[in-house]
Amino acid sequence: MLRPRAVAAVLLAALLSPFATACGSSPSGPAAGGRPAVTLAASDHLGGAPVYVAEEGGLWPAEGIEATVTTQPTGRDALNAVLGGQAQLGVVGDLPAVTAALGGRELRVVADLSRFSDWRLLTRTDRQITGFGALKGRRVGVPQGTNVEYALSRMLASAQLTASDVTVVNLAPNQVTSALARGDIDAGVTFPSFYDAARTALGGSYAELPFSGYTARTLLVAGPSASEESTTAVLRTLLRAQRELGADPAGAREAVLAQSKGVLQAAYVDAFQPRYTYGATLSPELLAQLEEEAAWAKAAQNLPGAADRAALRKYLDAGPLTAVDPAAVTVR
């Protein structure tokens, strides 16, 4: 089990390593067509669905930009691409953004793109875990440093437990299913895109506990090389994609599926995309949640940095969203 100080060291090493600053900055000049080039590191296909709708529909040029979108395995990886200069903008989860803020990194949260709260604790019938309290003393697999880890902390807290009451096993998102199948862990929490794989792998031994006590937020963040102008243009494009998603949900699901390039299955996209709430905002609820997560990260992982609301508010940049949709900015 990785102890809190070890976890803190791993997280900060990823965010503060020389590699993150020695790889050069992403292109910021005009692309071949004369439009400004913008690089965007995405992650969650469903949480960041407006990005993929925009990409599939070729919406970027209408706002005068040439966007290059890459997809990273997790929001943590997308964040590191932004911090390391490989991308100007990133689509990340709330916890990686909080971790970067506590580490004092140069980062701006420019929009909360979507919300999701339909979590599952995955387990096996032979482990007889019928409530979160039964996790005490068990081995639980989770991709640490992602918002999935925070989801686990909320599950434990719902039964008055903490990470010290279980053995946390750090696994990649796609390793949780195989670890469960082998019996290496008693339970696991991973991204929803792996739920069906776990059900298939475990067959009649599959069991799950639903949990809605944590709303994961997919954020659009800007790094130091992202200009206000290009960030505003990206947001304007994403708001158009957001409208298209609302007007034609089935078409949006097809766009996301096509952009996943075989990573996602149609049944998963059809089942789970409707469970996300879309709409770019900057709200008091977002700031309150970032404050709660920062307090947890400091206590659980011994991370540095100020966790109070005033300190975290400085990382919210309302300028671009205010320029394209003033009513969506309610945080003060």
Residue ranges and their predicted role:
Residues 298-332:
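Conserved C-terminal helix/tail region of periplasmic/extracytoplasmic solute-binding proteins
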Residues 24-27:
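Bacterial signal peptide processing site
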